């Protein structure tokens, strides 16, 4: 729909698509099923190599922007050794409430309960059980 493409419209009226869209265009022109057992499916589409070359010349200018975006998102919930690595993250202001403050010394962390290990899920779990009393002795 048009609504999905809304974030990609810029002041040039979408004359120049974002780099990701361009990479997907290359992928669509040479699909993953291009290489098959016994050889390739067909010749490369006309103009594909020229388009990839032009894209790679222009994309190299945006490498720093992409690196900044990908390396600064590991500070909020670090994993592996990210909490031991020193790097800066831009800090802004919050427009939402802080929520519950855990007292010092108490432990709080985000968890997932995919199997319903939370108390609120007990009613739903019991409701999904189909108890047949004739088979209880088994």
UniProtKB/Swiss-Prot annotation:
Its EC number is 7.1.1.2. The keyword Calcium does not apply. It is a peripheral membrane protein. Pfam families: Complex1_49kDa (PF00346). Core subunit of the mitochondrial membrane respiratory chain NADH dehydrogenase (Complex I) which catalyzes electron transfer from NADH through the respiratory chain, using ubiquinone as an electron acceptor. Essential for the catalytic activity and assembly of complex I. Redox-sensitive, critical component of the oxygen-sensing pathway in the pulmonary vasculature which plays a key role in acute pulmonary oxygen-sensing and hypoxic pulmonary vasoconstriction. Plays an important role in carotid body sensing of hypoxia. PANTHER family: NADH DEHYDROGENASE [UBIQUINONE] IRON-SULFUR PROTEIN 2, MITOCHONDRIAL, NADH-UBIQUINONE OXIDOREDUCTASE 49 KDA SUBUNIT. This is NADH dehydrogenase [ubiquinone] iron-sulfur protein 2, mitochondrial. The lineage of its organism: Eukaryota, Metazoa, Chordata, Craniata, Vertebrata. The gene is NDUFS2.
